[in-house]
């Protein structure tokens, strides 16, 4: 498994824990990785994301199959069912069926409640190098690989101009948000994909803002508060089913407040 050799080697050469939580961003290959682990351990890969329920868990306890049961938290949340399924998942990781292994998949630890997380061995995917990502798709501007930081994101990536425009939008916000009124600030929603599929995702926007503010902070420490604020909002954006429009608007208003004072 290119880019995850150390983690892969550790998992295929030792006994698998009964309950596992894999943390890796979109496009890092969690499903393919787990399938390969299952093949090496001669376990049937069974994705129960769509079917997880108390009734299913009860059925698994009387099954004699030797399986790896997989639950994708992000996929489950997109159907607004994660909260209703937490108790079933908790029961499964607390007492996994005999001869079976549980794999919970998520993008960030914050997406998994503590009672589930605390009962799993947590495995984190390593970051991919820019050199490796360049082999998948070449961009002349290395900054783009900070935004598209997994193979899957790079494969889905569009033309370079799209990202150059995003850098320009973020630069303009940083330089001008202090003199914008509330109406001007909220008008920036037009760049996002809340109502426009061609717009930028909230994750991509925050990733870009954090990167650019960090670069500015290295040259001018007055940007530290803006960088810290952005880091906080990056974490908030990882919450499942968050109201992205509300989060985006609040971020810009708080950012304006920081630069108003400086």
PLM regions: where:
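Conserved catalytic segments around the Walker B and adjacent sensor/switch elements
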Residues: 41-50
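Charged, glycine-rich active-site and insertion segments that engage polyanionic ligands
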Residues: 1-42, 98-101, 107-262
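Structural motif
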Residues: 71-72, 103-105
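Short beta->alpha connector loops
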Residues: 49-53, 106-109
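Conserved alpha-helical scaffold flanking the Walker A/P-loop in AAA+ ATPase domains
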Residues: 9-13, 51-93
């Amino acid at each position: 498994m290119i880019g995850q050799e150390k983690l892969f080697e550790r998992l295929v050469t030792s006994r698998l824990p009964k309950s596992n939580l894999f943390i890796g961003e979109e496009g890092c290959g969690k499903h393919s990785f787990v399938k390969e682990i299952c093949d090496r351990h001669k376990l049937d890969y069974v994705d129960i994301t769509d079917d997880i329920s108390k009734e299913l868990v009860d059925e698994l306890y009387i099954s004699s199959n030797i399986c790896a049961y997989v639950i994708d938290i992000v996929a489950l949340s997109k159907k607004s069912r994660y909260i209703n399924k937490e108790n079933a998942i908790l029961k499964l990781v607390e007492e996994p069926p005999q001869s079976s292994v549980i794999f919970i998949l998520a993008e960030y630890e914050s997406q998994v409640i503590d009672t589930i997380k605390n009962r799993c061995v947590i495995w984190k995917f390593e970051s991919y190098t820019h050199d490796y990502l360049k082999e998948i798709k070449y961009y002349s501007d290395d900054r783009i690989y900070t935004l598209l930081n997994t193979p899957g994101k790079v494969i889905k990536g569009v033309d370079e101009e799209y990202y150059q425009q995003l850098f320009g939008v973020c630069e303009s916000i940083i330089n001008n948000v202090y003199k914008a009124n509330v109406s001007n600030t909220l008008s920036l929603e037009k760049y996002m994909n809340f109502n426009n599929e061609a717009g930028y995702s909230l994750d991509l926007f925050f990733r870009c803002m954090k990167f650019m503010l960090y670069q500015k902070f290295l040259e001018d420490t007055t940007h530290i508060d803006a960088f810290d604020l952005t880091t906080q909002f990056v974490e908030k954006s990882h919450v499942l089913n968050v109201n992205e429009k509300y989060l985006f608007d609040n971020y810009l208003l708080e950012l304006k407040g920081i630069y108003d004072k400086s």
